[in-house]
Amino acid sequence: MKRKDTLKDYRGKSIDQLQEAKIELLQQLFSLRMQKGTGQLKKNHLFKSAKRDIARINTIISEKNK
């Protein structure tokens, strides 16, 4: 159910808000990479979820631009 809720949330936002959310996710992904490099990261599944959320946002942005 979480995916459907996030999709509804993303679709309700404007393009500018989606761009901001994408930037936040990219920053989160960068911080996860740094934690992995230093050996502090124990939850590797967060990479996959962050990348998928970024892809979802990119898809919605392209849909709204049409």
From Swiss-Prot:
GO terms for biological process: translation. GO terms for molecular function: structural constituent of ribosome. One of its GO terms (cellular component) is cytosolic large ribosomal subunit. It comes from the Bacteria. The keyword Zinc does not apply. PROSITE patterns: RIBOSOMAL_L29. Keywords: Ribonucleoprotein, Ribosomal protein. HAMAP family: Ribosomal_uL29 (MF_00374). Belongs to the universal ribosomal protein uL29 family. This is Large ribosomal subunit protein uL29. It comes from Francisella tularensis subsp. tularensis (strain SCHU S4 / Schu 4).
